Each structure stands twice: as C-alpha cells, then as structure tokens.
C-alpha cells in the first residue's frame, strides 16, 4: 500500500470509528430525543466523506474507478 493510500485508509478508519461512536451515543437511554436527532443528522455526511475517501484511496492504489 502506498503512503498516500495508507493515509486515506487511516482517515477512513477514523471516520468510521467516529460514525459508530455517534450512533452508539445517539442510542443511549440517557440521550434526549432532540440530541439523538441532531447527532444522527450528521451520519449521512460521514457516509459521504467515507465514500469519497475510499475513492481517493483506490485512486492512490491505481484501482480504476
């Protein structure tokens, strides 16, 4: 894996971990419905960023789109 691809892989992993943490916190019984809604509204943005980073990682590895 190239250094650039390694960078993107670390970024993908950190974004995936953060996304999972948001979902976990939003589903805690102590989280208000309003806060949970606000947290979960961020998830599609994380999904988009992760998908884009996967494309960049693949491009760094020379994988055709």
Roles of regions detected by a PLM:
Residues 7, 11, 24, 28-62:
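Short, charge-rich amphipathic interface segments used for partner binding and complex assembly
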Residues 1, 61-65:
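Glycine- and charge-rich intrinsically disordered segments
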């Amino acid at each position: 894996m190239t250094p650039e691809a390694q960078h993107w892989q670390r970024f993908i992993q950190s974004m995936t971990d953060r996304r999972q943490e948001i979902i976990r916190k939003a589903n805690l019984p102590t989280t208000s419905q309003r806060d949970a809604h606000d947290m979960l509204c961020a998830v599609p943005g994380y999904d988009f960023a992760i998908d884009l980073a996967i494309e960049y990682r693949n491009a760094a590895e020379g994988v055709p789109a």
